[in-house]
Amino acid sequence: LAKENDVEADIVVPVPDSGNAAALGFAQHLKMNYEHGLIRNHYVGRTFIEPSQKIRSLGVKLKLNANQTTIKNKKIILIDDSLVRGTTSYKIVKMLYDAGAKEVHVKIACPEIKYPDFYGVDTPTKKELLAANKSNDEICEYIGAKSLKFLSLNGLYKAIGFENRNQTYPQLTDHYFTGDYPVEPIDELGDNKITQLSLLSLSLIHI
């Protein structure tokens, strides 16, 4: 993420606790100041898995508070591990500006999440995934940031020790970024679903 950075700023601020590790590594690599510009209440759970938008928005307000002394009149690089619906990012960016930040540049330590993870817990449908429905510029405008950049797919692989992604046999289950599911999700195939189910039935008969 740091190697792909193209923004100059005063401080690096993580979204606690999800962005802590990425923000620390980012700041160390670029020799920037790492600051806790957001203070987290650890007695409030993860907001993106709450059942409704209203509750998620309230959860952000209860969970995080801006450290005005740290961020006032500063150009900030705000780092989080992911951006799903955009609820948390929008609220946090607004919170930082309300506390006096001069600029807020958002960096996400993974590629755009464009596809549901059917192997996950309470994963949103595709229509709820912000990156599946908006361009980078549109997402940036939606969350109110000065700029927005996601880690590239190859950048993700390089960050954990691979030279590049193996296009034929990916080293990771990265289907939520690429749509390249290990097993094609039948209920998402539309008109092709009946054909797929028929083939599955024939396969089972011959087992």
What are these regions (language model features)?
Residues 1-204:
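PRPP-associated nucleotide enzymes
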